[in-house]
Amino acid sequence: MEVNILAFIATALLILVPTAFLLIIYVKTAS
C-alpha cells in the first residue's frame, strides 16, 4: 500500500495548526 505523502502532510497540518493555535492562545492567557 503506497503512502500518499501529500495526504500525510495535509493530515499533519490539519492536526498541528489548530494545536499550535490553541497552545498560543493558552500561553497568552496564562501569562
UniProtKB/Swiss-Prot annotation:
The disulfide bonds in this chain are none
Q: How does it sit in the membrane?
A: Single-pass membrane protein
Instruction: Name its GO BP terms in alphabetical order.
Output: photosynthesis, light reaction
Q: What InterPro entries does this protein's entry cite?
A: PSII_PsbM, PSII_PsbM_sf
- The protein depicted here goes by the name Photosystem II reaction center protein M
Family that this chain belongs to: Belongs to the PsbM family.
Look up keyword Transmembrane and say if it applies. yes
Assembly and partners are described as:
PSII is composed of 1 copy each of membrane proteins PsbA, PsbB, PsbC, PsbD, PsbE, PsbF, PsbH, PsbI, PsbJ, PsbK, PsbL, PsbM, PsbT, PsbX, PsbY, PsbZ, Psb30/Ycf12, at least 3 peripheral proteins of the oxygen-evolving complex and a large number of cofactors. It forms dimeric complexes.
User: So what does this one do?
Assistant: One of the components of the core complex of photosystem II (PSII). PSII is a light-driven water:plastoquinone oxidoreductase that uses light energy to abstract electrons from H(2)O, generating O(2) and a proton gradient subsequently used for ATP formation. It consists of a core antenna complex that captures photons, and an electron transfer chain that converts photonic excitation into a charge separation. This subunit is found at the monomer-monomer interface.
Cellular-component GO terms for this entry: photosystem II; plastid membrane; thylakoid membrane
NCBIfam families the record matches? PS_II_psbM (TIGR03038)
Q: Where are the transmembrane segments?
A: 5-25
Query: Which Pfam families does the entry mention?
Result: PsbM (PF05151)
Keywords, A to Z, come to:
Membrane, Photosynthesis, Photosystem II, Plastid, Reaction center, Transmembrane, Transmembrane helix
Q: Which SUPFAM superfamilies match?
A: Photosystem II reaction center protein M, PsbM
Q: Does the keyword Cell inner membrane apply?
A: no
Q: Where in the cell is it found?
A: Plastid membrane
